[in-house]
Amino acid sequence: MPNIDLPTLEAFVHAIPQNYKGPGGAVAVVRNGEIVLRHAWGFADLAARKAMTPETRMPICSVSKQFTCAVLLDCIGEPEMLDSALAAYLDQFEDGRPAVRDLCNNQSGLRDYWALTVLCGAAPEGIFLPDQAQNLLRRLKTTHFAPGTHYSYCNGNFRILADLIEQHTGRSLADLLAERIFAPAAMKTAELIPDTALFNECTGYEGDTVRGFLPAINRIHWLGDAGICASLDDMIAWEQFIDRTRHDENGLYRRLSSPQTFADGAPAPYGFGLKFEETGGKRLTGHGGALRGWRCQRWHCADERISTIVMFNFEGNASDAALKMMNAALGIPPAKPVRAQANPGWFGSWLNPETGLVLSLEDAGGGRMKARFGTGPEKMDISGENEAQSSMTTLRRDGDMIHLARKDENLHLAMHRLKGKARQDIAGRYRSDELEADLLLVSEGGAIYGAFEGFLGKSDMYPLYAAGPDVWLLPVQRSMDAPSPGEWKLVFHRDAAGRITGVTVGCWLARGVEYKRL
């Protein structure tokens, strides 16, 4: 490819504080192992007036997953070496237990454990300890799809992986990372700090320019799925290590970034803690990270030996910034989608009965819709009277049915339009035997509210909103991890006499949790 258009790239970077508004951040572009651009702005701590620098450490959150998998490959070998240990770990499973490779590739079908903490009554700013993580993970008995058939993001996959690595080696993951990954890669200040409450070198901020920015409170312990703190310079060193070892057939990053497939042979979007994407016909590998008050993203294009890194100490869209930086570095112009007018027949709520997942669509203007299906809203471009798509989802409407496809997830669902009013007779207490947790629903002044109770405590009351007959939505916008699960979908079940017998509770991260009415 021709040389990078440095003025265009610099102009984009210098506009980041205006386009991604927040306290501070740091970004870099690396090509051929050399630093093209390295820039920090703003403040690491607004109150202390401490400036952000390329040496400032920040939590890299889920970007840590690739390093956990790197330790696995470097210290133990192929994932199958730990399959018997996983069987002992998930000894409550009834059938269809995943393999360790499924954990590494986010194909396990396990429900995300941070989402499950909500159902177990956790407070968003509560304390979460290592024994509580094992308590939750070891009680699991089922998956929300057959392992190897689909993709679903699950932090618990990598928490379990960390436990298995430590058990197998007899050493702490922190020591293994320092010795086998950080030292060879010259990541001089990178460190595993599992307790988020202990990190105080830089402050992460909740909020925005409308509500203001407030220091985020985090008191969770995470391991394997996240926990590494690193500076921009540390992350640059990782990209340079990747470039130095690019010709090594057994090089760590070559092994981590190798293509993966689903059980049916279809290409998978994720492997060994790395997300696979494509831009302008070029394959990218990388990962994002999030915690309340923090966002980061790295991308690597092996074909062109280019990497981009974005680190924010606020909840800005680091993934968007990193991809746009990559496109600028690759000389890929912004896409110009062709949009059609929105047909009102799109708008409303749609249910897939098999998964209990709900798709909500509303007009966003300019030939776009706002869709709620996963962890956060998506903007869908309407490309025809009955077709719409985003970067993740394709929709095709046929009257009162929408065919939803998420190719990367190997997921195809028939969504049926919800029509009619919801009955108000849902108040009561419901029990999940698998989680040993309760859902309490009450009616106050004609409005329905719900609360979760379990071994982690009793949650606040959350309002419920009717989506259709026996289908309700319970939004949860703050939780221990970020992003939050979003809208929980509640699908109620009745007997022949019309009495409610139970409810299926789920979201994209944790589907199909069955509760029976007490």
From Swiss-Prot:
Belongs to the peptidase S12 family. Its EC number is 3.4.11.19. The keyword Mitochondrion does not apply. The active site is at 62 (nucleophile), 65 (proton donor/acceptor). Inhibited by beta-lactam compounds such as 6-aminopenicillic acid, 7-aminocephalosporanic acid, benzylpenicillin and ampicillin. Inhibited by p-chloromercuribenzoate. It catalyses: Release of an N-terminal D-amino acid from a peptide, Xaa-|-Yaa-, in which Xaa is preferably D-Ala, D-Ser or D-Thr. D-amino acid amides and methyl esters also are hydrolyzed, as is glycine amide. Substrate binds at residue 481. Residues 373-392 are annotated as: Disordered. Pfam families: Beta-lactamase, DAP_B. It comes from Brucella melitensis biotype 2 (strain ATCC 23457). PANTHER family: BETA-LACTAMASE-RELATED DOMAIN-CONTAINING PROTEIN, D-ALANYL-D-ALANINE-CARBOXYPEPTIDASE/ENDOPEPTIDASE AMPH. Residues 477-487 are annotated as: Important for specificity. This is D-aminopeptidase. Hydrolyzes N-terminal residues in D-amino acid-containing peptides. Keywords: Aminopeptidase, Hydrolase, Protease. One of its GO terms (biological process) is proteolysis. It is an enzyme of class 3 (hydrolase). It comes from the Bacteria. SUPFAM superfamilies: beta-lactamase/transpeptidase-like (SSF56601), D-aminopeptidase, middle and C-terminal domains (SSF50886). Homodimer. The keyword Isomerase does not apply. Coiled coil: none annotated. InterPro entries: Bact_CellWall_Synth/Modif, Beta-lactam-related, Beta-lactam/transpept-like, D_amino_pept/lipop_sf, DAP, DAP_B_dom. One of its GO terms (molecular function) is aminopeptidase activity.
